[in-house]
Amino acid sequence: MFADGRPAGHSRCDSRPSGAGVALAFEGTLGAPRPDHVVAGEASLDAGSCWARVRVAFDGLSVPLDVPPDVLLEIEGAPALVGATAQRLVRAGMRPGQSRDIEVVRVRSDRSVTSIAGRCIWVGGRDWQLILPLESTGFSVRPDGAVAGVEAAALLVE
C-alpha cells in the first residue's frame, strides 16, 4: 500500500536456466487499479548468483544501468530481484542471525539510479531485513530465491 492507501500494484518474475546461471524476466506495475508506472526487464545471473547483465525500462523508456556483480539490486515495482542477493549471501556462508554490509543499487520509477551503502540481515528462516540510512525493509525469500513477500519500508527517525 502507498501512504495514501492505494494498492501498490503487482509484480512477477520468471526464471529459467541459462548456461551455468539463471535468466530472469520481470515486470510490474505501480499503482492500482490503474497503473501509474510499468516496469519491465531482464537480468542474468552467473553460477555464483552475481549479476552478469541487467536491462530495465520504466513506462517503455530504457534506464541506463551498469550494475556491479555483487550488489543488491532494488528496482521499484520488481521486488523479486532481492532474492538473488539472499541466495548469493547464503552460498558465501552467511547463517541466520548474521549480517553483511552491502552496496544497494536502487532504480526508481522516475528512472533515477542511486547507490547506497546498507546492511543485509538474515533474521532466520525465510526472513531477511535490509537496513538503509533512514529506512528498513523486510522481505521473505523462499529456498529457490523467489521473494515470497515484502514488508512495507519503515522510515527510521534519527
Regions flagged by a language model, labelled:
Residues 2-64, 145:
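N-terminal mature ectodomain segment of secretory-pathway/periplasmic proteins
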Residues 46-136:
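Solvent-exposed helix/loop surface patches that form functional interfaces
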Residues 24-27, 49-51, 77-80, 153-156:
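Glycine-rich loops and low-complexity Gly/Arg-rich segments
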Residues 1-3, 28-32, 107-108, 124-128:
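Intrinsically disordered, low-complexity segments enriched in polar/charged residues with Gly/Pro
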Residues 42-47, 127-157:
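Gly/Pro-enriched, hydrophobic low-complexity segments
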